[in-house]
Regions:
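Lumenal/extracellular ectodomains and adaptor appendage modules
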Residues: 1-374
Length: 374
């Protein structure tokens, strides 16, 4: 971490235990946590130097599955991350401490980009800061013809967005109109719309108008009345959906929200809203973070075990696609032998790696270097 690590990976034994497939839906926490699919990576590390090396390692193992059971609506108990508690990290057979980390992961994994998302604290951002002021303006719709079932409220932004960002819950669309950006939301009488102004507050508040439908072409009667104003810090704003009882650290959550907001920022500082109250819990890559120490000329065996979930395709005759991220191992100074063992009673239809041989209890593959890809 922060400098080149001299440690060599002499061998990795990668074992997939796929004795059962997950269900497409779970009715209870207990049923979900009883799923046994896991992946184990056993490394033999060698330190060729004449000094002791202490290294912080990061092991990504994917997002929580959308068919998982993360929140019990009956007991109101948070389950997010509970599936990692039965697995651990060992060095020479002794369990060591690990920390569960999270990064924003709406896209496919890219090594350099996704490693850069991990921070020891709040991420430094050219615009956002935890103490930055945020004001929420709540507007209530009224005076709209009740016969209009697709009425929309809109206002326009101008300027470069360098001093102020605008986030609106439930925005239904936006449209570039010359040097302005039109933002709209579906409304009917009594509907409330929250607009968040982040950073420097504008001299003038939004000048709303009502249109007959989402095309925003024909204006009609109606108004948006300012009914509430609330001030907060940007950190408080990012934490609107954060659960303090979750396995996610506050800073990892904050950094994920920032990444999302930068990703979905449009013209004039407008941030498109895809997630209710900035809830990023379904888009987080999970990592184990832990520390190892190897003496001069020393070797250790380090084993990491984590749950593994496939993507499920089809219903009547489903296929199950498993992905393991090999690319992070490219960061080692040297990587020698890799052995992959898949313990399963099922048939493997295809693999991105060539050379698997069938065995009595599954499949195996041996390589004298790290294969490209995942």
């Amino acid at each position: 971490k922060d400098e080149e690590c001299p440690v060599i990976v002499e061998r990795e034994l990668l074992t997939f235990d796929v004795s059962e497939f997950p269900r497409s839906h779970y009715e209870s926490r207990e049923a979900f946590l009883s799923y046994s699919g896991n992946v184990s990576a056993e490394y033999t590390f060698y330190n060729p130097e004449d000094y002791t090396v202490t290294a912080t390692l990061l092991f990504p193992f994917g997002k929580a599955p959308d068919y998982g059971f993360q929140y019990d609506t009956v007991t109101m108990e948070e389950c997010f991350g509970a599936d990692t508690e039965k697995y651990g990290v060992t060095v020479n057979g002794e369990e060591i401490e690990k920390t569960l980390r999270h990064t924003y992961a709406a896209d496919d994994f890219e090594l350099e980009r996704d490693l850069a998302k991990l921070h020891d604290g709040y991420a430094d951002d050219p615009f956002y800061d935890p103490d930055m002021p945020v004001t929420r303006y709540t507007y209530t719709a009224g005076g709209i013809d009740p016969e209009l079932d697709a009425a929309s409220a809109g206002f326009r932004l101008s300027g470069g967005g360098g001093k102020t960002k605008v986030y609106m819950e439930d925005s239904s669309g936006y449209n570039r109109l010359g040097k302005e950006l039109e933002i709209s939301a579906w409304v009917n009488n009594g509907v409330q719309v929250d607009v968040y102004m982040i950073g420097e507050q504008p001299e003038e508040l939004p000048d709303w108008y009502i249109c007959e439908d989402g095309s925003m072409e024909e204006r009609t009667e109606g108004e948006m009345t300012l009914t509430d104003v609330e001030e907060m810090t940007f950190r408080e704003f990012t934490m609107m959906s954060y659960d303090t009882d979750s396995h996610i650290s506050e800073t990892d959550w904050y950094n994920a929200v920032i990444y999302e907001m930068n990703l979905y920022e449009k013209s004039f500082g407008f941030i498109e809203s895809f997630f209710d109250k900035l809830d990023v819990s379904d888009t987080l890559m999970r990592w184990y973070e832990y520390e190892i120490t190897i003496g001069p000329g020393g070797r250790i065996t380090n084993e990491v075990t984590a749950p593994v979930y496939p993507e499920i395709h089809g219903e009547s005759n489903p296929t199950y696609d498993y992905t393991y991220l090999l690319s992070p191992a490219q960061t080692w100074k040297e990587f020698h032998d890799l052995e992959v063992v898949i313990r399963t009673p099922y048939i493997m239809r295809e693999s991105s790696l060539e050379g698997f041989e069938e065995t009595e209890d599954g499949y195996t593959l041996a390589a004298d270097s790290l294969p490209p890809g995942e």
